[in-house]
């Protein structure tokens, strides 16, 4: 230990520091920046419901998808010890969930309520109350009862312009302070125990104060607070008169940035550590004025140690520090070393939390207030997600948690056992028993090359004997699933292409991998080892999925790959599946009919069934619409708990995990989803019994285990109603709305049109219309399908029962029409952004403010050459209808008259009605005749599409 020395004087001389104050009175009118807006709330009856400490946590598993376990820790947030007497219980965060972990019983109680990652949390001095907050645009602060695990109060939109970066309870836990993440940061104090939705005090900090990221109350005085950043410390005071004092120290510390500060336990002082091993002691006085700068004789600099101090806290008249070496030191108020813990084998320390009770009774003579006492157990967390418990009386410690501290992109379930493999970007691999909740085997880079990022893994399909692991370097290793060891002969390195997908064949004899170079690599088991067969570049854009199947006429495996280029590829064929949508994933559809189908999900919220032999689209269905398209799907195995005998599909979107009842039919009530990883899902897998789904969160360094309840999903689906009732909710106005009446009118008009508009015979009403009327009817309902989409739609109805009856369907009723319309139309219509993108791709800058414009001749050429090319007759018919042109006389050539100006009246030429330069507004309003839209029709600056994108789309 280093005592104060002469070097401290030099440090003081090199520092520039100041301290000033701000006062503001309680008043309703606004005050200037840096002053406080006081909002007085009447005292109301408290909302906190007391629960006994021995009450059990209650978990709600009556939802289709419920969170069961969180594997992983947010290492940037502190870990708090809640109980350390008969049971060891502590609190930490992972992703958007708070976790109360009972180490004694190996159980978790999960604090769910946030839709964004938890950015900060705190506990009260008595460990009774917990506060969690996030940084979403609609930031939320939730206060929890640590005994029951239920939320007791929620603050919505408390910092809407950036979220919350720090929170803290007052010493008596009656108030809560929040520090915002806004551009101009705000500090708010809340009377949370009452029905409070507005802060008692609020101030906006000046930019020169720097970015504050930490705030606490003085535990002995609830009218005093401090906040700090890496370069500044602010002190606040609220008194009965309503004044709010702010002390600011601005300096440039020679040794390094500051760490979070604390209050002295007895004196009116603030202790501020630095990354240079220095502690600054601020002696404050009660007679400071607003914006006053503290003189130098009020600041003491103590050079405590050589290594950076990352954590400083005070407990029982002791000063406790944690540093970058993972050491914990205890000092008295004179900075004399009392004890130390240097053998914890930790990386830089993030937090130190002490138990609220002693291991045994100390100091019965009542000298605890004056003498330092080393009697409380504590937990220490590190930057690498390790949590260690230290028993002070026995001077022993044990590791409580050693979780992932790197992004997770690989997860796979064993085909026969309750085991799931998890791999992260540091090359670490773990196998976890999701029934007993403990790790079975770990491979922390042993046998794996250092620096390898583990991107994908999968178990062999039969007994799970092998575990194939793919790395970002392009390497593929075959590991023994029981030992996680590999034979050097079964480690294949093909740099530098990253492995993105892996799949075993049904007989576990083949393994296929997809790499970032758009190719597929194939391996085969040739006893006694795996061998490399070859690599095939099957796509010209990234591969989104690959899948093994079995030939219908043999037991030989066949391999399918799916790409962003919209191609479905196997060794025998290649077929373009979509015109504009991008397929995201695929899987085998369960045998619900005599045909074998591949189900493919696209970025347009659609799911399509393709015949595995003919590759024709047999059905188009509306998929889950929960904010982002489905990116991965899997058919869950039938379990013993599945009383209905139905089939189910699990899926993940960008940030959600969900469950879908099969068969797919577009019913929105047959699907449920919940937020799983707000920062994005990187991988998912499901258990062999279909009762658990696992999601990897990538950058949030967590794997979440989700328990499935099929009965809850079936119950939710039943609430949606029968027959067409669920589909009416997807129509504007519902069953009794104007749009539904329009559908009925058009439906019966199609019957009249089919019977002849000028027919004088008695009309024969029918519950069905012929399929020939379907394309026109869809366009009348403002859905404009392409010719390929029309063909898919007609085939879907025409061949709907062909495999069962051998007959074609030639007509359709109103109920089937409504389902067909809902499933085929764009899920969210045509957006202005899509039109803007099209003009950016096709046009050239030349309009006002650099907006893209399209040349008239260029547009006509594109319509006749690209995509589904139109003939001149079709163009003439379209523009005649759009512009209301008169019909051409019988003795005139319609093709020549419409496109040429020779010997033709000006009223029939395109030049007279279409401007030479076409902007987005002209195309939308003048040509298409659509109503004026919002100002959102503004192209993104600096963006220009390419001909390659045009060819693809």
What are these regions (language model features)?
Residues 2-101, 234, 280, 286-290, ...:
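Intrinsically disordered, low-complexity acidic/Ser/Thr/Pro-rich linker and tail segments
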Residues 802-846, 861, 865-870, 881-953:
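EF-hand and EF-hand-like Ca2+-sensor regions
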Residues 71-72, 111-113, 156-159, 203-207, ...:
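Surface loop/turn motifs at the tips and blade-to-blade linkers of beta-strand repeat domains
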Residues 722-766, 803, 808-846:
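EF-hand Ca2+-binding helix-loop-helix modules
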Residues 76-81, 117-122, 161-169, 209-217, ...:
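Canonical WD40 repeat/beta-propeller blade segments in eukaryotic WD-repeat proteins
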Residues 100-108, 138-153, 183-201, 235-248, ...:
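Per-blade loop-tip surfaces of WD-repeat and WD-like beta-propellers in eukaryotic adaptors/scaffolds
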Residues 94, 133-137, 179-183, 228-230, ...:
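Conserved strand-to-loop turn within each blade of WD40 beta-propeller repeats
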Residues 86-89, 108, 128-132, 153, ...:
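Structural hallmark of WD40 beta-propellers
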């Amino acid at each position: 230990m280093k005592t104060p020395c002469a070097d401290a004087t030099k440090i003081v001389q090199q520092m520039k520091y100041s301290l000033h104050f701000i006062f503001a009175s309680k008043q309703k009118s606004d005050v200037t920046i840096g002053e406080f807006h006081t909002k007085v709330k009447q005292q109301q009856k408290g909302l906190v419901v007391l629960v006994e400490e021995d009450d059990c946590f209650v978990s709600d598993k009556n939802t289709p998808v419920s969170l069961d376990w969180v594997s992983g820790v947010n290492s940037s947030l502190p870990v708090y010890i809640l109980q350390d007497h008969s049971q060891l219980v502590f609190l930490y965060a992972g992703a958007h969930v708070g976790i109360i972990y009972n180490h004694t019983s190996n159980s978790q109680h999960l604090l769910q309520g946030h839709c964004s990652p938890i950015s900060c949390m705190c506990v009260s001095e008595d460990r009774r109350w917990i506060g969690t907050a996030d940084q979403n645009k609609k930031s939320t602060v939730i206060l929890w009862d640590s005994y029951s695990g239920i939320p007791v109060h929620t603050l919505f939109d408390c910092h809407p312009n950036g979220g919350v970066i720090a929170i803290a309870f007052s010493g008596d836990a009656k108030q809560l302070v929040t520090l915002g993440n806004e551009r101009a940061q705000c500090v708010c104090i809340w009377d949370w125990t009452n029905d409070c939705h507005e802060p008692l005090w609020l101030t906006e900090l000046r930019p020169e104060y720097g970015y504050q990221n930490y705030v606490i109350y003085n535990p002995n005085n609830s009218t005093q607070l401090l906040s700090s950043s890496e370069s500044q410390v602010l002190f606040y005071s609220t008194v009965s008169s309503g004044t709010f004092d702010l002390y600011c120290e601005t300096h440039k510390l020679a040794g390094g940035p500051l760490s979070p500060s604390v209050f002295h336990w007895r004196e009116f002082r603030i202790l501020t550590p630095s990354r240079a091993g220095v502690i600054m002691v601020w002696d404050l006085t009660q007679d400071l004025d607003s914006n006053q700068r503290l003189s130098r004789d009020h600041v003491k600099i103590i050079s405590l140690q050589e290594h950076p101090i990352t954590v400083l806290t005070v407990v029982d008249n002791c000063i406790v520090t944690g540093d970058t070496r993972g050491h914990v030191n205890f000092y008295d108020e004179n900075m004399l070393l009392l004890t130390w813990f240097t053998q914890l084998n930790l990386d830089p320390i993030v937090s130190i939390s002490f138990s609220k009770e002693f291991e045994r009774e100390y100091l019965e003579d009542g000298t605890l207030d004056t003498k330092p006492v080393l009697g409380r157990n504590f937990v220490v967390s590190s930057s690498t997600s390790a949590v260690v418990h230290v028993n002070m009386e026995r001077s022993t410690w044990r590791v409580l948690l050693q979780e992932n501290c790197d992004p997770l992109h690989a997860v796979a379930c064993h085909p026969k056992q309750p085991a799931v493999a998890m791999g992260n970007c540091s090359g670490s691999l773990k196998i976890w028993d999701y029934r007993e909740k403990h790790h079975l085997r770990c491979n922390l880079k042993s046998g794996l090359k250092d620096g390898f990022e583990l991107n994908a893994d999968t178990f062999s399909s039969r007994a799970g004997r092998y575990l194939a692991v793919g790395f970002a370097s392009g390497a593929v290793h075959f590991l023994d699933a029981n030992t996680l060891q590999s034979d050097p002969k079964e480690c294949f390195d093909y740099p530098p292409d990253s492995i993105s997908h892996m799949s075993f064949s049904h007989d576990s004899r083949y393994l296929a991998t997809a790499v970032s170079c758009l190719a597929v690599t194939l391996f085969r088991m040739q006893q006694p080892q795996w061998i490399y067969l070859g690599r095939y570049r099957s796509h010209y854009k990234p591969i989104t999925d690959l899948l093994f199947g079995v030939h219908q006429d043999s037991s030989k495996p066949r391999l399918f790959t799916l790409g962003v280029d919209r191609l479905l590829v196997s060794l025998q064929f290649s077929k373009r599946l979509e015109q504009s949508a991008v397929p995201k994933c695929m899987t085998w559809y369960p045998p619900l009919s005599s045909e074998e189908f591949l189900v493919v999900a696209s970025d347009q919220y659609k799911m399509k069934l393709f015949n595995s032999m003919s590759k024709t689209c047999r059905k188009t269905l509306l998929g889950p619409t929960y904010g982002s398209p489905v990116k991965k799907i899997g058919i869950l195995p039938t379990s013993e708990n599945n009383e209905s005998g139905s089939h189910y599909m699990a899926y993940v979107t960008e940030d959600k995990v969900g469950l879908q009842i099969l068969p797919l039919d577009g019913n929105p009530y047959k699907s449920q989803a919940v937020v799983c990883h707000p920062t994005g899902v990187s991988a998912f897998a499901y258990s062999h019994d279909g009762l658990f789904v696992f999601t990897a969160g990538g950058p949030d360094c967590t794997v979440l285990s989700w328990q499935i309840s099929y009965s809850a999903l079936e119950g939710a689906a039943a609430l949606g109603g029968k027959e067409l009732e669920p589909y009416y909710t997807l129509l504007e106005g519902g069953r009794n709305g104007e749009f539904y009446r329009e559908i009925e009118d058009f439906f019966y008009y199609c019957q009249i049109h089919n019977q002849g508009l000028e027919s004088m015979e008695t009309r024969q009403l029918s519950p069905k219309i012929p399929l020939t009327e379907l394309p026109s009817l869809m366009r009348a309902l403002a859905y404009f399908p392409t010719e390929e989409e029309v063909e898919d739609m007609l085939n879907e109805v025409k061949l709907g029962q062909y495999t069962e009856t051998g007959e074609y369907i030639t007509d359709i009723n109103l109920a089937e029409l409504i389902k067909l319309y809902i499933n085929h139309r764009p899920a969210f219509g045509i957006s202005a952004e899509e039109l803007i993108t099209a003009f950016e791709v096709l046009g050239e800058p030349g309009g006002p403010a650099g907006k893209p414009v399209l040349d008239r001749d260029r547009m006509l050429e594109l319509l006749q050459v690209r995509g589904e090319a139109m003939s001149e007759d079709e163009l003439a018919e379209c523009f005649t209808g759009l512009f209301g042109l008169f019909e051409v006389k019988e003795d005139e050539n319609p093709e020549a008259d419409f496109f040429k100006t020779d010997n033709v009246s000006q009223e029939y030429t395109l030049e007279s009605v279409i401007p030479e330069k076409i902007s987005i507004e002209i195309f939308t309003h003048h040509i298409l005749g659509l109503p004026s839209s919002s100002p959102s029709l503004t192209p993104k600056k600096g963006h220009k599409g390419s001909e390659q994108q045009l060819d693809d789309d």
